[in-house]
Amino acid sequence: TNVIYGDNAQGKTNILEAVYMFAGGKSHRAKSDRELIKFGSDFARLSIAFSDSERDYKAKMQLRKGGKKAVSVNGVHIKKLSKLMSYLNVVMFSPEDLELVKGSPSCRRRFIDSSVSQLYPNYFVCLTDYNKALMQKNSLLKQLRSAGKYHDEVLSVWNGTLAEKGAKIMEYRKSFIELLNKFAGGIQEEISTEKLVLEYAPSIKNQDMSEESFFEYLEEHQ
């Protein structure tokens, strides 16, 4: 166990944030990379050394105000940030995480998305594809309504993509909650007489979470 301690404003949180950056590709608190770059500078550099049971790793990251971040592991450029999750797994708990209980469902979704992405790298890819399709659909809906229309064949195409990716996302989340229930429930029983039960309640009331049911729901609720 490692404990990092020091006076206020000495950079303790910065160290943890830097480690988290190499696990998830982004900060746990900043909305954009620009917020992580020192005032007056155009870029910032991070580096980390770690190892597993098989080999040692050295990772580097450069953040630029006007461009994408550049990441490499052992000298090999990483094109997709989701790849980082296969090297370094990190779980961060901060005071803000109390929002998991007190906050809105979006807080809990962000926690689940971050955790599931580390367990199943394909989940991150699926989630990214889903969000891109959702943006395209919303843009098309805005255009159609401006023209006084309410349906278009292209909408069904985007609904098909959303249904395909969305059904997979819900399955991943459901599996994660079941796994979390198994382990967290046992820990809760050791420290308390209370029973901990977590339930996954998606906004789409779809019992089988099938792609077909998801598509029908989207077609009916444009």
PLM feature spans:
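Long, charged N-terminal accessory/stalk domains
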Residues: E99-L100, S106-K149, E153-S156, G160
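Nucleotide-state sensing region of NTPase/ATPase domains
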Residues: A23-C107, D113-L119, Y123, N181, ...
